[in-house]
């Protein structure tokens, strides 16, 4: 979780094609909205991230819940440490400017961040839902990772002192043609959601919208890819 050099893992063919399409269709039907940030007691459009998207809590859709589970297992952090998943659509001209995902402790943060209670964003996971000429770029590392359907990008955000790692700065470039679709999950150092027991109960009470693939088969595929990844490259440092 804490490292002198950011651990960046890229693994292809993790997300099934029909799962990616399900998430895109689900988000289109929900109606992507501009990203907002709190400023002086008001919500204003985020000029850093000009894409449109939606956020979803665990338990709102059984299919998307499989993403929480599989990504949790991949980064070795409990589902309860995850923030709500963010699903974003980027069109030409839309981008996410260079930024750090981790919070700075002396910043004037909204109370909803709950930094002291829940800790910082230790791990970020980006799932690529379609092929695009856009990329996730780490400027200080000279690294660009193109968006390819099924690809998962996972990286640590904190250094050995549990502070935002300078080299973890990254950006989402704009597509020259078409759209870029991704989801992002941030995992905190400590639980951010309700207890696992409550989450499991909530999940069991929810019914998914119509699905076009087998989520159990998808979960098995993700775990197979995760084991291959960890055998070849090692797990995220804990």
Go through the PLM ranges and name each one.
Residues 1-238:
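Fe(II)/2-oxoglutarate oxygenase catalytic core
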């Amino acid at each position: 979780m804490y490292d002198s050099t950011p651990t960046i893992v890229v693994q292809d063919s993790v997300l099934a094609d029909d799962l990616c399409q399900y998430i895109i269709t689900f988000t289109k039907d929900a109606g992507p909205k501009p990203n907002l940030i709190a400023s002086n007691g008001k919500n204003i459009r985020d000029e850093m991230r000009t894409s449109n998207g939606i956020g979803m809590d665990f338990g709102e859709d059984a299919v998307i819940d499989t993403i929480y589970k599989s990504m949790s297992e991949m980064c070795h952090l409990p589902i309860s440490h995850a923030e709500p998943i963010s699903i974003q659509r980027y069109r030409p001209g839309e981008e996410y400017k260079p930024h750090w995902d981790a919070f700075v402790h002396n910043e004037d943060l909204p109370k909803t961040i709950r930094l002291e209670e829940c800790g910082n964003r230790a791990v970020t996971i980006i799932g690529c839902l379609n092929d695009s000429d856009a990329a996730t770029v780490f400027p200080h590392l000279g690294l660009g990772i193109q968006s390819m359907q099924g690809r998962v990008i996972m990286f640590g955000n904190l250094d050995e002192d549990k502070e935002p790692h300078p080299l973890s700065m990254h950006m989402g470039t704009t597509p020259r043609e078409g759209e870029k679709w991704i989801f992002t999950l941030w995992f905190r150092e400590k639980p951010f959601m309700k207890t696992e027991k409550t989450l499991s109960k909530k999940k069991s009470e929810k019914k998914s919208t119509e699905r076009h693939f087998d989520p159990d088969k998808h979960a098995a595929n993700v775990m197979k890819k995760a084991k291959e990844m960890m055998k070849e490259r090692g797990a995220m440092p804990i």
